[in-house]
Amino acid sequence: MEYDWTTSGYDATVAQGVTPEEVHHVLVHSKARIRRYEDDHLRIIGRAYTGRLIEIWLREESSDHWLVVIAFEAGLAGQLVFRRLFRE
């Protein structure tokens, strides 16, 4: 997956205490739950190398290129869905 950051997305993610390295790991190296929630948006939940479960919202910029809108530590609902799907 090719992705870039929006300026506001990078700032919002860092403000949530999530590092760009954690986001990269989830998007490139982690098993993840991917859900399209609008025609041009994705919601991804995956485990970062730090062990934290990270939720990432992306907006499609062009075919197969995405912009990170925000990333944050997954809440209880995200954790339950991820555990059910991946039996963690």
Residue ranges and their predicted role:
Residues 1-88:
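Ribonuclease/tRNase effector modules and their secretory precursors
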